[in-house]
Amino acid sequence: KNKTNKEIALRTLKFIVDRQIVKKDPTCDFSGLIVGTVGYLKAQFVFSKEWNNCVKVAGFYSANGEEYPPQVLDETGSCYIPEKALKKRSFKIQVFGKREGYFIPTNKIEITQDGGRI
């Protein structure tokens, strides 16, 4: 059975969420990102225990704060990065967790698509 791009991302950007701080996973290569990607990039988050039993949503923003469509994370802590976010040289990611009587946001982290420049 053939899989579509929506079923398989070819590249995953990995992040670590410790309490309210989101940061790039130091074992993940964030270099060589090219502006204009569609259906290729996913974000995946690993969470500390404060996030247990929360519905988790990733927020995506332009460098000047414009909000792109938020994405609910799946059971692996992953989501596709919205096409609109990937049209600019840089974008920001923030994560939110919610359960009854509980809400936890993170900081925003900026991702730069360096166009393959070294």
Regions found by a protein language model. Name each.
Residues 1-117:
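N-terminal assembly/attachment segments of tailed bacteriophage virion structural proteins
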